[in-house]
């Protein structure tokens, strides 16, 4: 059956006889695997490389390389084996480029990636996946783009126009007579037509301008804006109906009109509920150095004022760029990757948690559902490339261990588990996990990094405090007498996750040299002489001791970059 070309051809009633998937697991329990569809795996039968060593990703260039949806389906065991319970697919709808963020057809799958049936099959296989004889349902998240379209039309003369004080330029010509789809989007008034923006953090330019050649939708609070967002709502609800996907990662949310974002989230959430999908997850890309901006986007009950209107953005979560990217030039708010590599002190982590705890007095969402990561597919915030670039295996393991065991919903970028270390730009950090010139793949389950991440993920899955608990950074001491929060570049970074009467202690030596530090634990939970058991990274137990001050502590001898979990 041919794909629809108009919204008038879309039926959003439930598929006859279809029982839609509703996972009871909370999203903060999940471990998300983010993959670039074109770069993960193709549909060929391949033999994974073996051995404990890390791999170098395959260079691919800036065009379609061959990855497919079927390649994901065929390798669900690899993703589940890592401990992941959700997959975030880069955009799979028909687009002008391999990355998919420049959509030209919202109603069909890009033929480079496969077919609608391939997506349906992937979701069904993921929902029904069995690991070690037990159900292991994997959620599938679609990456959706509603702020802008692809480069589907041009300005007069065929050359770039640039933002100039909000001036609206004339429409030029469509690049194709049969795109974009649905046909309703072939309305020049549906686009702001203000030219390419230069300032991505300055309003109103960052909500009116095009992102390079990608054309910005008119998503204002007016009649045209309502028509545009309603069209996009229908288009993406179509994919919930047809494929039973479990969530949307919303691209470039910061550049959308707030009313449009609110309407999209509210309508999509209601539609998912109507199908029985109670836990549909909506998280957005808000590249921002401030938690206050994040705060305004989170939760269907969180509102902001837009003029005389009260607007509820309605996102469940945002990607935690504030943690990963930090604040440029501010050592007290350093990027997480530089902290975990010992290049900056940890004060930024402590400051941020204190701010989050203060905000939680009024609302509890921030930090609960933030999607945390140490690297991804965009180079604009990663001047040194992927996290593994210049990092040892142990440092990569420690970094992913940190996001697995700290607040938030952890997300790993494909290839990190194999030590991919691309740097220099987007293309270099979007390596392939297969080589079209041979029959092997880089899905190596014997790689040390892969295996150790899987072990930590298993601990996270088994220990409820690591999924639901409160979090506190812990004071340390080199002499078991004088305790304080660590500083500098050589220290043990320690945190506790607390859930009712259970504490799980996480510690990571951020330096390459062995060190022994004593770490505070909760004195109300441990009697002197009691023990904590290694859950990961060590064997046996450590004894709880009491300082002269009455504080309880354990002493941890750690090798360089050693990561441990105790409970």
Residue ranges and their predicted role:
Residues 18, 24-30, 38-85, 91-243, ...:
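Substrate-binding/active-site clefts of carbohydrate-active enzymes
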Residues 31, 545-567:
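C-terminal beta-strand-rich structural cap/linker in extracellular carbohydrate-active enzymes
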Residues 36, 89, 252, 414-416:
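A secondary-structure boundary/capping signal
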Residues 36-39, 93, 110-113, 146, ...:
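Short, flexible loop/turn elements at secondary-structure junctions
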Residues 85-87, 246, 410:
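Short acidic/polar active-site loop segments enriched in Thr and Asp
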């Amino acid at each position: 059956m041919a794909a629809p070309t108009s919204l008038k051809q879309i039926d959003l009633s439930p598929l006859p006889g279809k029982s839609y998937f509703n996972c009871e697991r909370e999203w903060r329990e999940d471990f998300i695997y983010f993959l670039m569809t074109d770069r993960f795996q193709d549909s060929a039968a391949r033999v994974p490389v073996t051995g404990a060593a890390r791999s170098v990703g395959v260079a691919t260039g800036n065009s379609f390389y061959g990855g497919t949806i079927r390649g994901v389906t065929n390798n669900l065991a690899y993703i589940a084996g890592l401990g992941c319970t959700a997959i975030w697919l880069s955009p799979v709808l028909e687009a002008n480029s391999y990355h998919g963020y420049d959509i030209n057809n919202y109603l069909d799958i890009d033929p480079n990636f496969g077919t609608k049936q391939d997506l349906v099959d992937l979701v069904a296989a993921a929902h029904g996946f069995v690991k070690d004889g037990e159900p292991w349902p994997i959620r599938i998240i679609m990456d959706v783009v509603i702020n802008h379209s692809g480069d589907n039309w041009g300005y007069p003369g065929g050359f770039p126009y640039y933002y100039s004080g909000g001036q609206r330029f004339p429409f030029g010509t469509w690049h194709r007579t049969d795109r974009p789809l649905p046909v309703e989007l072939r309305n020049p008034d549906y686009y702001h037509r203000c030219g390419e923006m230069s300032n991505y953090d300055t309003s109103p330019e960052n909500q009116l301008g095009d992102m390079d050649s990608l054309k910005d939708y008119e998503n204002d609070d007016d009649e045209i804006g309502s028509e545009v967002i309603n069209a996009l709502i229908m288009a993406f609800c179509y994919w919930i109906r047809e494929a039973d996907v479990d969530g949307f990662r919303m691209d470039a949310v910061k550049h959308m009109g707030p009313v449009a974002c609110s309407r999209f989230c509210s309508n999509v959430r209601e539609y998912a509920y109507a199908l029985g999908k109670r836990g549909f997850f909506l998280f957005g890309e808000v590249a921002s150095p401030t938690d206050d901006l994040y705060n305004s986007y989170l939760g269907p009950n969180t509102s902001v004022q837009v003029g005389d209107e009260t607007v509820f953005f309605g996102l469940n979560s945002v990607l935690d760029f504030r943690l990963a990217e930090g604040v440029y030039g501010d050592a007290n708010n350093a990027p997480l990757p530089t902290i975990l590599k010992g290049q900056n002190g940890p004060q930024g982590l402590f400051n941020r948690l204190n701010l989050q705890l203060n905000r939680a007095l009024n609302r509890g969402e921030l930090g609960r559902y933030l999607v945390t990561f140490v690297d991804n597919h965009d180079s604009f915030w990663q001047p040194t490339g992927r996290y593994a670039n210049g990092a040892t295996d142990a440092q990569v393991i420690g970094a992913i261990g940190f996001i697995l065991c700290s607040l938030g919903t952890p997300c790993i970028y494909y290839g990190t588990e194999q030590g991919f270390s691309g740097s220099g730009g987007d293309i270099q950090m979007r390596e392939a996990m297969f080589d079209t010139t041979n029959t092997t793949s880089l899905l190596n389950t014997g790689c040390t990094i892969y295996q150790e991440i899987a072990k930590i993920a298993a601990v996270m899955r088994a220990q409820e405090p690591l999924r639901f608990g409160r979090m506190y950074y812990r004071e340390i001491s080199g002499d078991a007498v004088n305790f304080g929060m660590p500083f500098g570049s050589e220290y043990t970074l320690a945190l506790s996750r607390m859930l009712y009467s259970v504490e799980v202690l996480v510690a990571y030596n951020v330096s390459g040299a062995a060190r022994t530090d004593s770490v505070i634990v909760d004195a109300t939970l441990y009697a002197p002489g009691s023990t904590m058991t290694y859950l990961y990274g060590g064997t046996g137990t450590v004894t709880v001791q009491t300082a002269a001050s009455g504080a309880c502590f354990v002493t941890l001898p750690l090798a360089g970059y050693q990561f441990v979990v105790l409970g």
